């Protein structure tokens, strides 16, 4: 279910704060990821918004997954999502769920498009894998076991 805040007063456009700007989970933007350190993804590249829509509305930051056109490197990695055929990309690309990061909305350059529902579902599974959420999100008994041993 897609829940979109009806009013997004906290995140107006930086050039015209009276115009609300709504960022949605699954949106694709060009972003400036410089400066970066070490093996962090850097440069001006596409990113996919993975943060929930309520936080997208009220936070000055976004949680994003960077995208690369280097689809040959570890194409079968469970935290990589191949996107082929999405009009936002000029060539097949890979969403790097293993490299999610928090960025300021000011790093966004321009919108590129949106993920399709099947692409977003594949990204959800990649994030569940990367963040090791499968057991905790989908299994109530695991949470109850955690509570028993960590009180």
Language model segments and positions:
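Short alpha-helix capping/helix-loop boundary micro-motifs
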Residues: 13-18
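Compact nucleic-acid interaction/catalytic patches
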Residues: 39-44, 49-85
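C-terminal terminal-subdomain/extension
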Residues: 1-3, 8, 21, 85-151
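Short, charged beta-turn/beta-strand-edge "cap" motif at the junction between a beta-strand
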Residues: 34-38
């Amino acid at each position: 279910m897609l829940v979109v805040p009806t009013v997004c007063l906290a995140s107006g456009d930086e050039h015209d704060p009276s115009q609300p700007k709504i960022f949605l989970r699954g949106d694709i933007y060009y972003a400036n990821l410089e400066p970066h350190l070490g093996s962090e993804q850097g440069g001006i590249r596409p990113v996919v918004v993975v943060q929930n829509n309520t936080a997208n509305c009220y936070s000055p930051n976004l949680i994003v997954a960077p995208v690369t056109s280097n689809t040959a490197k570890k194409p079968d990695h469970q935290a990589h999502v191949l996107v082929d055929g999405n009009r936002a990309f000029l060539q097949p690309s890979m969403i790097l769920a293993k490299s999610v990061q928090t960025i300021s909305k000011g790093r966004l350059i321009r919108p590129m498009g949106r993920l399709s529902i099947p692409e977003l579902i594949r990204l959800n599974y990649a994030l569940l894998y990367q963040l090791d959420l499968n057991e905790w999100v989908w299994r109530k008994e695991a949470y109850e076991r955690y509570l028993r041993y960590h009180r």
